[in-house]
């Protein structure tokens, strides 16, 4: 079986969804920009040699509809002979895109794939056109379709207080701002055209979603967003609404060596699981355990984790049940996470994997794990090994 390697990984800056940098930039353009950039950064690979493009996107309608992967590839002037498919596993879409490409390479059906994902939550809101089947409530709690309420449920089940959530959210912003200031994101962010507050076209090379002024005291003043009477989850402890894209160049190890391209990491194992939709945010726990089992590793073998921060109330129970509470500041989301950077749904799987690869190199660790919860009760995880 072929070894699957990541040759390169990049992303756009994360733009605010409400009147942000990409308010006049379409999702296809964000995607095409990264496709062009990945190929330009790796000229040893001819675009025509790509076997397929796998691109995650959740709200596949309006500008994100009609197979955005193919639309973006055509905009990027990728040769018409290269196919492209859009992948949807909700929040895990672009990580699923990576898994799909990896399996193709493992079986010998492909040698080089471009993977990634996008979501423009300013142009296509998460709730746009959603129409749940009325009979679904016979099998699943109606509130399971409301992500904020599932986070409230997890917080109550695991004893996660409002204070703990506020502290974690403040940490996310502080870490992300420190990473920005130190240049830790420089290797992953591709400068991307957008408009500033005055409407002037400029190149953005930083995440505009981060709020460096965030404090625990300020967060404590916010009202509960989903359960006004008894809730603890606020807008400040939820992932920010943002627009962005991320992309990775994935190849067989043998093809990378043939072309003289240096792999950054191997895909050591992959896992996806289902869980109770009412606690959809718990998915990373069984997904991570399964991925570690497939890799023949334990939690203690992983040097650094990227866990998508859908909500502080959601990620803290996962950290707790993976036995990592005492190691948060050594191993978990060291450059902040979605609370600070935002969670553009179809982009996030590739985004956290990209950030993880850079952290693994910076911290000089052998193994890293990226994992995320998925709406309606799923979890997805990938174990990476540095080459």
UniProtKB/Swiss-Prot annotation:
The active site is at residues 91, 343, 373. Pfam families: Thiolase_C, Thiolase_N. CDD domains: thiolase. Keywords: Acyltransferase, Cytoplasm, Fatty acid metabolism, Lipid degradation, Lipid metabolism, Transferase. The keyword Acyltransferase applies. GO terms for molecular function: acetyl-CoA C-acyltransferase activity. The keyword Chloroplast does not apply. Its EC number is 2.3.1.16. Pathway: Lipid metabolism; fatty acid beta-oxidation. It catalyses: an acyl-CoA + acetyl-CoA = a 3-oxoacyl-CoA + CoA. GO terms for cellular component: cytoplasm. It is found in: Cytoplasm. It comes from the Bacteria. GO terms for biological process: fatty acid beta-oxidation; phenylacetate catabolic process. Belongs to the thiolase-like superfamily. Thiolase family. Heterotetramer of two alpha chains (FadB) and two beta chains (FadA). Catalyzes the final step of fatty acid oxidation in which acetyl-CoA is released and the CoA ester of a fatty acid two carbons shorter is formed. Involved in the aerobic and anaerobic degradation of long-chain fatty acids. This is 3-ketoacyl-CoA thiolase.
């Amino acid at each position: 079986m072929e070894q699957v390697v990541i040759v390169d990984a990049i992303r756009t800056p994360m733009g605010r969804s409400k009147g942000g940098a990409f308010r006049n930039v379409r999702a296809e353009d964000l995607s095409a920009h990264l496709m062009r950039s990945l190929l330009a950064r790796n000229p040893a690979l001819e675009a025509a040699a790509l076997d397929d493009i796998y691109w995650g996107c959740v709200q596949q309608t309006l500008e994100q509809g009609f197979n955005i992967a193919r639309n973006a590839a055509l905009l990027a002037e990728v040769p018409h002979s290269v196919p492209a498919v859009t992948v949807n596993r909700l929040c895990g879409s672009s990580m699923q895109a990576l898994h799909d490409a990896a399996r193709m390479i493992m079986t010998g059906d492909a040698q080089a794939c471009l993977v990634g994902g996008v979501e423009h939550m300013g142009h296509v809101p998460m709730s746009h056109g959603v129409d749940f089947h009325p009979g679904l409530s016979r099998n699943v709690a109606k509130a399971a379709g409301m992500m904020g309420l599932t986070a409230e449920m997890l917080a109550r089940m695991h004893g996660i207080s409002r204070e703990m959530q506020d502290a974690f959210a403040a940490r996310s912003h502080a870490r992300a701002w420190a990473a920005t200031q130190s240049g830790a994101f420089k290797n992953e962010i591709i400068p991307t055209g957008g408009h500033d507050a005055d409407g002037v076209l400029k190149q953005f090379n930083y995440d505009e979603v981060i709020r460096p002024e965030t404090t625990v005291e300020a967060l404590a003043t916010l009202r509960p967003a989903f359960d006004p009477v008894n809730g603890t989850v606020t807008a400040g402890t939820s992932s920010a609404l943002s627009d962005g894209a991320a992309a990775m160049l994935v190849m067989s190890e043998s093809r990378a060596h043939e072309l003289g391209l240096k792999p950054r990491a191997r895909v050591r194992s992959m896992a996806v699981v289902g869980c109770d939709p009412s606690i959809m945010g718990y998915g990373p726990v069984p997904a991570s355990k399964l991925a570690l089992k497939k890799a023949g590793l334990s939690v203690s073998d992983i040097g650094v984790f990227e866990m998508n921060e859908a909500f502080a109330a959601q990620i803290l129970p996962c950290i707790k049940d993976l036995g990592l509470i005492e190691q948060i500041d050594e191993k978990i989301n060291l450059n902040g996470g979605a609370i600070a950077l935002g969670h553009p749904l179809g982009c996030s799987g590739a985004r956290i994997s990209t950030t993880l690869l850079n952290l693994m190199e910076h911290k000089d660790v052998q193994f890293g794990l990226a994992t995320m919860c998925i709406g309606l009760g799923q979890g997805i995880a990938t174990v990476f090994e540095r080459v």
